[in-house]
Structure formats: C-alpha cells, structure tokens
Amino acid sequence: MATMTTTVEAQPVAEPSSMRSVPGTLNVPVAKFPPPSRKDLSVDAEEVASSIVEAFNSAVSKNDLSAVSSLFAQDDGFRLKSIAIDRTSEFRSPKAMHIDNLDQVLGVQFFFTLETKIGTGQGLARLTEVGDGQWKFFTFYTSLGELKGHEELINERRPKGVEHGGQVGRKNWAERREMASEYQNGADPTVVVIGAGQAGLTAATRLKMLGIEALLIDQNERVGDNWRQRYHQLVLHDPVWYDKLPYMDFPPSWPIFTPKDKLAQFFESYATLLELNVWTSTSITSADWDKKTQSWTVTVTRKKGDSTETRTLHPRHVIQATGHSGKKNVPDIKGMSDFKGSRICHSSEFSAALEEQGRLGKKAAIIGSCNSAHDIAHDFVEKGYHVTIVQRSTTHVVSSKAVSEIALGRLFHEGGPSVEDADLFLHGLPAPVQKAINIQTTKLCAKLDKDMLVGLNKAGFKTDMGSDEAGLLFKYFQRGGGYYIDVGAAKLIADGEIKVKQGQEISEVLPYGIRFEDGSELEADEIVYATGYQNMRTQSQIIFGDKVASKLQNVWGFNEESEMKTMWQDSGHPGFWFHGGNLAICRFYSKLLALQIKGLETGLYRYGDF
C-alpha cells in the first residue's frame, strides 16, 4: 500500500475559477484612464515635468495642502519636504509617452528623488493633460531608499575588512566569520529569519547592509535545498533578467531560464560570499514573545555533524520567510489510504518519474492544472507513462515567450534598464492602474499564444484570462496560483500525449485509480496531487503555535485600499514579519521590510506609525 509521503471601492471577489482568490482578499477594481487628449508626442516633457515639480515643491514648502491637491487628477496628500527630477539616465529623464498600453492616452513620465525628515528615496510620476496645456499627476509613487544617518554599508561605506599593523592575538577573516555566525557568549541576533530560500536570503542581506545582525535558520541540510530537492525537471519559468538578487548579479553567461539545481548552487554561493549567518539543519522548538522586553525567546534544535545542540536566542524580530504559501494542500478523499499503486503523493514530495516504470506502460494521474502539474506531467510523458491531468475548473495559460517578450520584455531584457529602475517602474503603479494595463497586456499575450490556446481548448483543457481578464500578474497577487507559464506541456496536451479529465471533482480514490462524481473512472498506477498550498498563516501556526498565529492577519491578496495584505508590513503581532514571493518580488520588498526594522531599531518610529 502506498503512503502519503485609487478611489474606486473594491468589491468582494466572485466565485468563478478565473476570479478565485486567497481568503479575505478583495478584487482590485480596474482603473479608468483619462480620455485621449493629444494625438502625437509633440510635448516638451522636460518643461512639463519641471513646471509641476516646481509647483509641487512650492506648495509643500508652504504646507499648502490645497495647492498640493490641485496638482493631482484625484485628491491625495503627502508628507514630503521636496522632490527633484532625476536625470541620471535616459530611462529616468522626463519623456512624453503613452500611459495606457494602447497608445491612445498621452502622458509625461519622469523619475524623481525625494527627501523627508528621516530619509531620502525615489519616485515615479505620470502626468496627464486635463486641459489645453494643463498637466496634473495621474499617478505619483514614492519609495523610501535610505534612512538619514543609517545608509547601507556599500560602495564608499563598505567595510575595510582588516586593520593593518601589529595586533597580538588578532583573528583572521575565517576565524572572525566563525565567531560571528555562532553567536556565542550571550551574543544574540537582532533578527531571526526562518527559511533560507530567496525570501530569507534577500531579507538577511538587506538587514546586513543596514548593519543589523540577522541569523538565518533552515531545516534543510544546505542552503538552496528548497530548490534542489524539488522535482527533477524544474526550471524557472521567469527569465534571468527578472530574477536577479540584490547586490550580486548572475554571470553574463547565465541561461535565460534557470535550472533548479543551478539556482540552488547560486543561493549557496550567495550566502557565503555575502557573509550571511546561516544555521542549516535547524528547527524551532518554541518561540515566545515577551511584551515587557519587546523581544522573543526562540529555542532551536541544531544538528552539527553527529551531534545535536539546543540553543536559545533572544531576537527582537522574527521574519517568517518560508515561502508565500503555507501547508501543502492535500484534499481528504475517501479511499486514499487504500491506494495500491506505486506512488501517491503531493507535488512537493515528487522528485521524478521513473523511466523503468514508464517502459512498463504505467499510468499517471496528476490532480491539478497549474505550473507544477504541467511540469510533472511533462516529466511523466518523457519517461514513457500514459498521463492524464485532472483539471477541475479553469487555468490561465501563457507562454514563456509571451511573458518574456510582452509582459516583462519592456523592462527586463538584455541591455534594458537597471533592475532598480525597472522595479520602480513596475511597482510604481497603483494596483487598479496596473490591472487596467494588464488587461491589455493579457490580450496581447493571448494574441501571440492564439494557436497554443486553441490547441488546449480543442483537447478539452479549459483556459481563462484571469481576474477581470487581467491575466498572470493578478492571478498571482490575488490567488497565489491558478496559472501555467508554458514551457512545453501545452503542445503535449494539444497533441494528445497528455490527456485531460475536465470539470469533475474526485469522489473516491480506488485501489488502482480514481472515481469521479459523475461515476466515471480513471486508471492510475501513480497519483500526484499538484493542488498547491494553504495560506502562509497555516505555516505560522505549525512553527509558532496558536498563541502567535491567532494574532496574525490574513496574508497575501489585496485589502480595501488595493494594497497587498500583511506581507512586508505590520503582521498584527509586534516583532513578527512575513516575507515571500518570487525572486523579483523578494528583491524589491526585502529592502522596504529591512528599512522598517531599521527604523524601529533606531527609534525613528514605533509600531503603529506605519
């Protein structure tokens, strides 16, 4: 027997598969662009930008909120001292451009630098013409870059590394690193980061660059095992230009789509070269918050060679960086324990299809129809199995070519803008505006992918265009899944090499197959549940228990203001933070998370101020 190894009010998300989302999230409304004004780009963007910046700074210096509001197409307010146009690159300089993705609504875009009482940062503005020659802010985005007096320890502020001259008993670099990473003699990290994947690594690195002691702990034996131990054929579906990590770029010969084992090696090198403190083979046994001291008591069990040690740490912050998902989602279906085939497991436990089984004509059923399901089905086909994907609802499918060339190609490509500029451009749009643009982007992707989508639907595989037809990005942000970025399995489905069982829930697992609610049956020697994961809070409950988890807010999705919920911000429990997402999201938001912690540590602000 096998064993289970803007100002528009947001509305509640509807139930259709294309609109399904994580619990508690709201469906982001679609912003309306200003009506088309000019028919050409004959605008002096420099003059327009300079004029509105001058007016903005004048109003702010006088604390004239009415004058500030008059510069916006919609009312808003800001606490800034001044802004200045950023002309450090052609990409950042003021330019006339279309802002609606349809080449209809002309606007002026420019990057700017900003200053507040406690810090400096960057911003991105898009202007729209509301009258003949009258320009106002359509979108206005600001991002904190540095805290005054607490700048990152990079470039001209990098550490010296060694003090030259005679010094009795001086330790060399390797000895100093060993001492620093062990936290002996009562030393404690300021932050404990749980998980050493892309989320944990980026958070710890950002904190290190701000001079904050952070310790990464991971239950795996090696950094990178969170990728290394996944299924055999896994390759990143996003292109290399989108996936860069902060402070350390991929080599110029790096492949466009990164194999999982190669990424694992890079993670291990990243942790070593950036001198991150990492304890692998380490698990939390208890974690308690002391309200009086505003600190945690975290007890961990750590394997070191043939021995095991128990350590107690007292950090002031804990970051859960175990991925933006929680416990694996395995439906409780009648008969699962009676399955007599060779394997039944969740996709997280699947390593590879077995070629010797494929040669015997074995049958595999994959429950689910998103990225992991397709990759695993693809692997089974290549090993000679008869394969069926069980698709219960619909899936958004887009080719990796469309993602690379259309969805991301404008910003992330060879010779494109820096990732810092591209990130600011990408995240510098309010979610409703981003959704409006993505509706158009999704249509362009579908046009490129027309033959692929027709082939899938003819084969019985049902596709959708995502929430409000906004495609991949909003499937990810509102649901955390529900999509497949095609790297080859779509053709296998269209050609009939991967069969599809569509639209039926499973009523029972049989000894050698599956029975559906309509009474039909599917033979299977192996069953893989590619059914995703539960909310990130479920992992919090496992690690920290109900006492902590009950105070945490729902994670992921959007709130009433169309902002992401709980991630990278106040979690509902002091000293507790969530961080996760793909490599690009971790790259961007890790800095904002680290700056919040630095601000708390330096007394620049307190819990509840942000």
Residue ranges and their predicted role:
Residues 2-65, 71, 178-188:
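Short, low-complexity N-terminal intrinsically disordered segments enriched in polar/charged residues
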Residues 5-7, 74-128:
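Surface-exposed, charged secondary-structure patches
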Residues 8-28, 103, 111-181:
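Short beta-strand edge/turn micro-motifs at domain boundaries
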Residues 76, 228-265, 396-463:
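Glycine-rich active-site loop/strand segments that organize a redox cofactor
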Residues 143, 260-365, 369-371, 378, ...:
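Flavin (primarily FAD) cofactor-binding/catalytic cores of flavoenzymes
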Residues 182-217, 370-381:
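N-terminal Rossmann-like FAD-binding beta1-loop-alpha1 element of flavoenzymes
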Residues 192, 205-232, 385-398:
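Glycine-rich FAD pyrophosphate-binding loop
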